[in-house]
Amino acid sequence: MLANEDRFRIFTGNANPDLAREIAAYLGTTLGDAVINRFNNGEVQAMINESVRGKDVFIVQPTCGPNVNDNVMELLIMADAFKRASANHIIAVIPFYGYARQDRKARGREPITAS
């Protein structure tokens, strides 16, 4: 086990696991053991296969691409799983933030989704 793994762990969703692996290698650690599955109805299931109790957890999950909503839901469900697993801090690393273009109202009755 690497020394950094005692303090923090890096996990990834399905949006860009290659980027997460590169970040982990740069920081001298490995990716945490988690599996993100989909049920037949499309719902997301996150399974954390290691203890993160008391550790800082970084979730690398861009929210871009053809499945913006799916990527956001993966991130939220993973964050909830880590909270329930007693992680010390949960930090979302979002290299591209989907919905960022919706940062102001252009018309009436329109949401500001980026806030």
Residue map of PLM features:
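PRPP-associated nucleotide enzymes
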Residues: M1-S115
